[in-house]
């Protein structure tokens, strides 16, 4: 029987059951947004269990009503050895639409998705369903939401963190799935053709050209969303992902921290605050970007956002980038339960 390790009113709950350890995000009214308190408690539990010889299996449980998996919540899912998604899961990285950039390690993850799918997802904010997440490599197993409770019970009863044993249990409950016929993953040839272009302007120009071809009616609404995003954020995001293709995970995290700090400090402009105003405060969905067009964004301004800090101000991260995306793993097994999703509460 699992034993509660924290106040039931706390924003993160920790449980222990034999060799299993369970982390549950507990902010339903805030859609389980990842705040500084959540990050602090996650670190407390994970650092404690990393030193616990009896801890063999760590299960993350993320659940909320609207089904979105984005921001910090998505970053908790993608690197895990086993990431379980359900029919209710929806994934997105729409940060550019609010004047931010694709952070939380996604310049690393997106740059390693098939072809130029990562650039497409980051620049357009397009959503993927669970089947598409599996196909793209963002999740490992599809389990019907009605089976999650029984799957969790089976995992909690495991007395081992052995990878093959955990995999065998999950595969008892999982179903092989393929993207639907109209899935964006069946349009990768078009995406690769357009989003491999060197600049955001060239990407949009190529995408507009493809939109005129019969059968490409799906492009018009995507273009509309792309044009609504912050021009500055789009350029920062594309450069970050392109750099990510040649960077390690620690290098990407360090870079993303630098970008976030410079954006929040309004080194170039205040687009992120304007985006938040339009989306969350006034909710008019009519942000006034500065500058208003891609052509007006100066290369030297983008360079300023990427400018390194002094060594003592840079993010300090471990040099080891062991994770599913690097094809190496830590001894302990982590399992993500995503009954619905999570997001980043900045």
What are these regions (language model features)?
Residues 25-29, 95, 241:
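Short, histidine-centered active-site or binding-site loop motifs used for metal coordination
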Residues 23, 60, 76-77, 132-133, ...:
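Hydrophobic/aromatic residues within transmembrane alpha-helices
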Residues 1-4, 145-346:
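Intrinsically disordered, low-complexity segments enriched in small/flexible residues
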Residues 47, 62-66, 106-108, 304-315:
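An acidic, glycine-rich surface segment that forms the CoA-thioester-binding/catalytic face
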Residues 1-61, 313, 319-332, 336-346:
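Conserved CoA-thioester-binding segment of acyl-CoA-metabolizing enzymes
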Residues 46-53, 114, 125, 159, ...:
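Structural signal for hydrophobic packing residues in well-ordered secondary-structure cores
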Residues 63-193:
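Conserved catalytic cores of soluble enzyme domains
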């Amino acid at each position: 029987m699992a034993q509660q390790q924290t106040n039931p009113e706390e924003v993160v709950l920790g449980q222990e059951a034999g060799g299993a350890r369970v982390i549950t995000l507990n902010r339903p009214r805030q859609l389980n947004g990842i705040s500084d308190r959540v990050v602090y408690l996650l670190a407390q539990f994970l650092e404690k269990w990393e030193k616990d010889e009896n801890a063999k299996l760590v299960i993350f449980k993320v659940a909320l009503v609207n089904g979105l998996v984005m921001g910090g919540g998505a970053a908790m899912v993608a690197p895990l050895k086993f990431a379980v998604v359900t029919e209710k899961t929806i994934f997105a990285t729409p940060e550019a639409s609010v004047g931010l950039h694709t952070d939380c390690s996604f310049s690393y993850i997106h740059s390693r998705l098939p072809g130029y799918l990562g650039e497409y997802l980051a620049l357009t904010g397009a959503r993927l369903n669970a089947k598409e997440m599996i196909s793209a490599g963002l999740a490992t197993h599809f389990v019907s939401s009605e089976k999650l409770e029984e799957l969790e019970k089976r995992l909690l009863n495991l007395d081992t963190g052995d990878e093959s044993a955990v995999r065998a249990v999950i595969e008892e409950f999982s179903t092989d799935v393929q993207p639907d016929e109209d899935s964006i993953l069946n349009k990768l040839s078009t995406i690769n053709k357009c989003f491999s272009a060197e600049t955001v302007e060239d990407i949009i120009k190529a995408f507009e050209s493809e939109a005129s071809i019969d059968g490409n009616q799906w492009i018009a609404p995507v273009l509309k969303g792309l044009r609504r995003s912050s021009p500055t954020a789009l350029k920062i995001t594309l450069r970050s992902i392109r750099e990510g293709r040649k960077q390690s995970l620690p290098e990407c995290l360090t870079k993303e921290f630098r970008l976030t700090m410079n954006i929040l400090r309004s080194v170039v402009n205040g687009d992120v605050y304007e985006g938040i105003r339009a989306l969350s405060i006034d909710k008019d969905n009519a942000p006034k970007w500065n500058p208003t067009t891609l052509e007006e964004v100066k290369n030297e301004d983008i360079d300023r956002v990427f400018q390194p800090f002094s060594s003592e101000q840079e993010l300090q991260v471990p040099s080891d980038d062991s994770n599913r995306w690097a094809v190496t793993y830590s001894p302990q097994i982590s399992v993500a339960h995503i009954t619905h999703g999570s997001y980043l509460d900045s």
